[in-house]
Amino acid sequence: MGLEEELLRIAKKLEKMVSRKKTEGALDLLKKLNSCQMSIQLLQTTRIGVAVNGVRKHCSDKEVVSLAKVLIKNWKRLLDSPRTTKGEREEREKAKKEKGLGCSDWKPEAGLSPPRKKGGGEPKTRRDSVDSRSSTTSSPKRPSLERSNSSKSKVETPTTPSSPSTPTFAPAVCLLAPCYLTGDSVRDKCVEMLSAALKAEDNFKDYGVNCDKLASEIEDHIYQELKSTDMKYRNRVRSRISNLKDPRNPGLRRNVLSGAISPELIAKMTAEEMASDELRELRNAMTQEAIREHQMAKTGGTTTDLLRCSKCKKKNCTYNQVQTRSADEPMTTFVLCNECGNRWKFC
């Protein structure tokens, strides 16, 4: 069995362990990987780094996590090594454009180029078909047109649905570096959207922060708290995204990028805590107005200090007695606390 086949087999085993949340035996597989002579081409073709990173994030065994970190660090150093040969560098650049496998020098624009080429290539194909129909009388020009059409069809073959660089697949791979992938499509998409929210304005570059890494940490804290990707998880992520992208609340995004608000804190903050100062003041004003209206709406009654409010524990109350049942039944007493506006009744 070749080294590439062995790495593919190990990667499949690690992915199954992560999906089943059973990582027994992962240490032995990582030790095998540590003894393998790794190359850039093997890292790109087998995607072993994604599998090892998934084990690192989901395994609770400290020894396994430590060895996984060492492997990822060594492989990153291999990718960034200036001593790689010219051929390897060319292969690496080509692979990054097609599959988005680069981690340190990764750029999202390269992954978005295939859809633009496809969109721009369709009008040319239609014009060529019109030219070919109009030139049926001139037989010498037909072979050249056929050759050009065949060459263009060869160029367009990578964009077929069976190709790995289809428009629907390429952005999903290229928008997020492999070292931040979780192996779960829902979680990966949430990390992408959180990263986009952090990059909502161009000034994010002034903070010198890796937005993909920061978004991955925020998502990981949310997932570790909720332990699933159900509707509660999605609503939590959605509220972070809407508040980070809110142009009327730039202070929140600025505090997250500068580190004043940690990823763990932003993952647990409530909507009231994430709100801007202006919105907080508006909410407080509306609350006070509602309390005043509630207190003004009270009807006349008898003030007494014999009844204690169960909410504020004070004895400043007003009560009314009304016959709500038959005449031989006791009257119902309606009580209003003059301090906090709490209402209750008893017979």
From Swiss-Prot:
Q: Any idea where this protein resides?
A: Nucleus
The stretches annotated as zinc fingers (TFIIS-type) lie at 305-345
* Domain TFIIS central residue range list: 186-302
Recall the GO molecular function terms of this protein's record: DNA binding; zinc ion binding
- Identify the tissues in which this protein is expressed: Liver, kidney and heart.
Q: Which UniProt keywords apply?
A: DNA-binding, Metal-binding, Nucleus, Phosphoprotein, Transcription, Transcription regulation, Zinc, Zinc-finger
Comp. bias intervals (Basic and acidic residues): 83-100, 119-131
Where Phosphoserine occurs, the residues are 113, 139
Compositionally skewed regions (Low complexity) per UniProt:
132-142, 157-168
Q: Which GO terms describe its cellular component?
A: nucleus
List, in alphabetical order, the GO biological process terms annotated in this UniProt record.
transcription elongation by RNA polymerase II
The chain positions of domain TFIIS N-terminal read: 5-82
Q: Which Pfam families match?
A: Med26, TFIIS_M, Zn_ribbon_TFIIS
Where is region (Disordered) located? 83-168
Q: Which CDD domains match?
A: TFIIS_I, Zn-ribbon_TFIIS
**Where is Zn(2+) bound in this sequence?**
309, 312, 337, 340
Report if keyword Cytoplasm is assigned. Answer: no
Gene3D superfamilies, per this entry?
A: 2.20.25.10, Conserved domain common to transcription factors TFIIS, elongin A, CRSP70 (1.20.930.10), Transcription elongation factor S-II, central domain (1.10.472.30)
Q: Family, per the entry?
A: Belongs to the TFS-II family.
Cited function: Necessary for efficient RNA polymerase II transcription elongation past template-encoded arresting sites. The arresting sites in DNA have the property of trapping a certain fraction of elongating RNA polymerases that pass through, resulting in locked ternary complexes. Cleavage of the nascent transcript by S-II allows the resumption of elongation from the new 3'-terminus.
Which PANTHER family does the UniProt record give? TRANSCRIPTION ELONGATION FACTOR A PROTEIN 3, TRANSCRIPTION FACTOR S-II ZINC FINGER DOMAIN-CONTAINING PROTEIN
> Which named protein is this?
Transcription elongation factor A protein 3
Task: Provide the species name.
Answer: Mus musculus (Mouse)
